[in-house]
Each structure stands twice: as structure tokens, then as C-alpha cells.
Design a protein with these regions (language model features):
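Terminal targeting segments of Actinobacterial cell-envelope proteins
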Residues: 1-11
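Solvent-exposed, non-transmembrane regions of membrane-associated and secreted proteins
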Residues: 9-196
Length: 196
């Protein structure tokens, strides 16, 4: 005796799963596009604001943060890296810019200035940074130039890299490895000393 089983319900289920995956993919692509456009628009707006403040603003005597939280811009010409720096390291900030790490000095102050950004967006070019590369940091106080003295990989809880220094030092922090999928297990550290 032969039993016939209809494949119609299985086919409908598989088609439904297929459409579900397509909808999820479209949603993820849409979200990614929104995040990229939002970051681009934020950076354009803040770059214009920085240029306007630099043009119309008398140089303050103390380190300054604009009312919007804008601190300045980092440029590493050899790497083609240019990113706005704002105060804080919340998820929203790091989605749109590099963030000044609270508790570290501001540019222009003595000590270890800490700046962080995501490895898969703004700090992706750091994978190619080399000793003696020049980092330019433009702020409301003026322009600072730093020379890279070292890079290293540390654990995510190693805050010693941000400890104070008697000199003017810049520390860039991003997740590592650069091509890791998911939450990266380590941090990539770039240490630079001020030269002008």
C-alpha cells in the first residue's frame, strides 16, 4: 500500500521562510544605509561647524569644547583618515564620530588624551598605521601634531594605556582584530607624542 503525502504545505512553509529571510536582509541593509548616511551627514555638519568656529572664534586660553560637544578633527594624511572628534564614547557618538574618552585631558592639556572610534568605520585605516606617522588634531585651540611612537594590542579591560603622563600624549583606541565578526576580544592602541 502506497501512501501519498502532499508536499504543498512544506512548499508553502519554505517559501514563507525564504520571504522572511529576504525581508530581514532588506531590513538590515536599510539600517546599515541609514547608519552610514547619518554618520556622513553628522560629519559634514560638524566639519562645517568646526571651520566656522575656527574662522570666527578668537583662540581661547583654555581647552574648549563647543556647545554641541565638538572638540575637533583628527587627520592622518598617509592613511586618508579624517574624522570629527566629539566629547564622549556612547554608542550614538561612536556611530557618528570618534569620541574623546571622558576622564582623559583635552587636547592642549598636559597628559594622555584618549580618543576612541570603531574599527569597522572611522578607525579602520589604523590597521595600516606605522611608527613615525604624523597625526594632526585640529581643535578650537589650534592645531596639534603628534608622531606615532608605538602600537600594541591589549585586553579590553587594560586601562593602563590611558594613564596620565607628564608629556602631551595622544592615545587612539579601537577594537581588534580589525576583521573580526562580532564583539572583538582585544583593543588596538596607537600611542603618539606631541611634536608641535
Amino acid at each position: 500500500m502506497k501512501i501519498l503525502v502532499s508536499r504543498a504545505p512544506l512548499k508553502r512553509i519554505l517559501e514563507g521562510v525564504q520571504w522572511l529571510f529576504l525581508a530581514a536582509a532588506a531590513g538590515l541593509l536599510g539600517y546599515y544605509g541609514f547608519v552610514r548616511v547619518d554618520a556622513w551627514a553628522f560629519e559634514q555638519r560638524e566639519n562645517r561647524a568646526l571651520e566656522q568656529l575656527l574662522k570666527n572664534h578668537a583662540t581661547p586660553r583654555l581647552p574648549a569644547i563647543a556647545a554641541s560637544g565638538l572638540i575637533g578633527r583628527i587627520d592622518i594624511q598617509r592613511l586618508g583618515l579624517s574624522v570629527i572628534v566629539v566629547e564622549g564614547i556612547s554608542a550614538k557618538i561612536l556611530r557618528r564620530a570618534a569620541g574623546h574618552i571622558p576622564g582623559t585631558p583635552l587636547p592642549g592639556q598636559r597628559g594622555n588624551v584618549g580618543i576612541s572610534a570603531h574599527r569597522d568605520t572611522f578607525f579602520r585605516p589604523l590597521r595600516n598605521i606605522k611608527r613615525n606617522d604624523i597625526i594632526e588634531l585640529t581643535t578650537l585651540l589650534g592645531e596639534y601634531r603628534y608622531r606615532v611612537v608605538s602600537t600594541k594590542i591589549v585586553g579590553p579591560n587594560d586601562v593602563a594605556v590611558l594613564e596620565g603622563s607628564g608629556n602631551e600624549v595622544l592615545t587612539l583606541v579601537t577594537c581588534y582584530p580589525f576583521y573580526f565578526v562580532g564583539a572583538a576580544p582585544d583593543r588596538f592602541i596607537v600611542r603618539a607624542e606631541r611634536i608641535t
